C-alpha cells in the first residue's frame, strides 16, 4: 500500500481541495420575456439582452 512520506500541511490540504466543490451556474432572466437562461447566452426564444437576435420556428 502507498504511504505518504511527509505530512501534508493544512495549507497544502486546502489548496488540494480548493476546486472540489461545485458552484451553481449563473442564471439570468431575460427582461423582455422573463425566460431563464445562462448568462452571456441567447435565451431559448432567441432574445439576447432585450433584443431579438435569432429567428425561431414560431417567427
Swiss-Prot record:
UniProt-recorded Gene Ontology molecular function terms: structural constituent of ribosome
GO BP annotations listed: translation
Annotated signal peptide: none
GO cellular component, one term: large ribosomal subunit
Keyword field contains Ribonucleoprotein: yes
Keyword Ribosomal protein: yes
Protein name: Large ribosomal subunit protein bL32
